[in-house]
């Protein structure tokens, strides 16, 4: 299966509770992460992480599924239609 360029948006509502689990998963998939930007948003008491990824649909589904199972984490993603 071909890899495609895409993004993952992660919102963390309970940073102290979730950060270790989220970072462990991102480290596990580090070879497929092209860029990462993470910002705390104190006004809403959450943190936002945006990832640019180069993954297959299966890899993306597995990673986002694991992230989505962590309490206090919301995740959305998309891949390009074409193989880049």
Describe each PLM feature range.
Residues 1-84:
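Long, contiguous binding/interaction regions
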